[in-house]
């Protein structure tokens, strides 16, 4: 196991396809996230782009201000995986491997959570990655396919092959994101490995984060969906863990955070407007008048129209 970089807090931002773009990652980092992770990236795409790019940051955009920064990969072809790891290794602080995504369009490619059923291949994947880099290699897993019967075996293989940290989302692939995540499985995992464990799933408040840490013994927690509407949750959790209390976040502060995000998107040409619009819809969830605003946001065609809609909400709510 390689030494992990120091983290400024115990709270990490989850990699989320179409969501955790570099602008949101930078915002969350500034608001207290101890680690941010890129959206998952296909190893074949990295290899294919290598000859066209002067630097991998032209394909996977990021800012030095995000550090420590983890890049998440998926794909099971060992030759492509080795090459992809070598390409990204000089540019990132950690390399994460996705064995958690339940989406059929990736599991059908023998990738992500489909690999939970293939421990031998998984061992070769971990070994290939660790041997291809001097950076810490980490993995994100689920509990199993239809029952929680795979995570301990995969975790033991990970530890044996030199994986430095495991992030665990204790739902099955069949569950997707429905039902409740079973935190008792995080506790079971932590009791069976000696490497750091990151708990993930159903953390909506600072109280939830502390409860997960206390109930499971996990070393860190990872926030996904809750950060989509309130990126200040990282600051709140950090405050709560350090002092036992935290500041409430007003709708005005959430709106300010979105406009900060909007400014950051200008630094990254690969962020599409459709994603910016989706982020605006996420940020307005729970706000007074937010439902009507989201209906209007669905039809906006550019940043100017988006700003007009949000400025009306700010004026009406005195934000």
Predicted regions and their residues:
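Alpha/beta catalytic cores of nucleotide-metabolism and tRNA/nucleoside-modifying enzymes
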Residues: 1, 7, 22-23, 127, ...
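Glycine-rich, positively charged N-terminal anion/phosphate-binding segment
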Residues: 1-7, 16-87
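Hydrophobic faces of well-ordered beta-strands that scaffold small-molecule active sites
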Residues: 11-15, 36-38, 69-73, 95, ...
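Conserved, mostly hydrophobic/aromatic
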Residues: 13, 28, 39, 71, ...
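Active-site beta-loop-alpha junctions enriched in small/polar residues
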Residues: 16-18, 41-43, 74-76, 100-102, ...
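Alpha/beta enzyme core
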Residues: 82-95, 99-109, 120-195
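Short glycine-enriched, charge-decorated loop/helix-capping segments at active-site entrances
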Residues: 110-116
